[in-house]
Amino acid sequence: MVRIGAVRVGIVDVGANTLRLLVAAREDGRLVALREQRVQLGLGEEIERSGALGEEKLAEAAAVARAHVRRARKLGCDRIDVLVTSPGRQARNGEELASILREATGVATKVLRPEEEGELAWYGAVATAEGPPESVAVCDVGGGSTQLVVGTVSGGPAWVRSVDLGSLRLTRRVLETAPPTQTDLDAARAQVEAAFVDLAPPLALAAIATGGTARALRRIVGARLEPETLASAARKLAKRSDRTIANDYGIDRSRARTLLAGTLILLEVQRRLGIALLVGRGGIREGAALLALDELAAATG
């Protein structure tokens, strides 16, 4: 339970696949989620198809963000932030998207730089982990991009990289057919390997995977993603249609469609880190909420 009068913050996360709301407060040093909502919108799919967001999709995003902010206000949030991830960076009219969201919601709206997105995901994942060791790597596979961050509990993020390839983007490029042909599967693996070829992350004692792909994989193979586990999951997914994946594992159809692509990305990340990935409980929204709570606390002395 969160005490009456506790400071509350609302984070609206505008991603390639979904628009999500987190309303949270801090209780006994822990971040407590008071409300979470998710609306599938597919901004990244339209960006991949045409390079920009059309008027209809912009209007949909504005309406969903407005509803999320209205809900956050009803729940008594002291601060609400709208954060735009890859759609704001990858769409030709990303600035227009941010402007429309700002006008629709009346709250601060920011297009995150890749490094900012990665750092927030790192803070959110580490803060919600059970007794993390000193050095931790965090991988956040989004729809349009992937962030990989290594840092220390005492010092924060120290090594931050972003790859312009995510689960939705890879699906649109080479994995539209489900189940895929062997040619498509080979092409997907080649694209992933090429995207990560220059990444050599420092050693970490633990690694956390955040994002929708990791959460969905937990339903299939559990919370510990070893190389054999990820490879097995990829083989299973490559033999199924998205409808079958959704039915077999109780996963949303839209997530099932991009799950193989996300798994291939995580498999490459795990290979480069050299240690198992643990599915995290927090990510970018939790990191942003913690930052907002810290800033509010500092402002009030």
Locations of regions flagged by a protein language model:
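Early-domain small/polar-rich strand-loop-helix modules and first-structured segments
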Residues: 1-38
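Helical "lid/coupling" subdomains associated with nucleotide-phosphate turnover
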Residues: 6-9, 23-26, 41, 46-75, ...
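A short acidic Gly-Thr/Ser loop motif
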Residues: 13-18, 139-145, 210-213, 283-284
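Extracellular/periplasmic ligand-binding regions of membrane signal-transduction receptors
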Residues: 80
